[in-house]
């Protein structure tokens, strides 16, 4: 999945080269790189500052940045690259001439994605694992970033087991417009321990959509055993606000709209926001 961004290979660069004045015989010099809004799964902007920068430079991000496009405000002093962040952790960014000579290199860092779940009871911050559970992580972030979880409920609360949310609104009305079900990622080495975040599903393994749950205790019985007992896919963990989760778990529950274990007073997820 290595990405070699060959600037000259992108059709948009022909116009950029013209706008930048083309090659003037001076060697390009990169004096610094600045990255703006670098969050996993989102569009990042990379500013390459220097002198005599040309659009036939090569940039290698080792697959960390995909779908590259150049902003129209690029010039010979600043090349502005937009791309989608596809990896986390440290990665090298190397700028090369068209002949392959390295003229600048630096190491950039993309943090693990985090999402803030905002409720009246308080905020819960979950950290996701796109390395071991990329399908579940990308699915969850897709729902988060399109605002799907706004005003949904923690609709299933079972003390000493789980709190579950992400699929219903007030009155236990099922929310529509879910994306297609995703492939189960339960056999990836992540366990349903206290505080872990996992995808809820039906009895069919590959049926998870928007609903998720947080484990209140070590529920290793929910882990993958074999193909006949595939378990539930963990894709993250609570890193802040487990006390809020425990407070939700202490709320009285009953039967609402034919559903059991429903909090008698709505516990509303007012907003889910990607914070990193």
Predicted regions, residues:
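Sec-dependent bacterial lipoprotein signal peptides
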Residues: 1-18
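Cyclophilin-like peptidyl-prolyl cis-trans isomerases
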Residues: 20-276
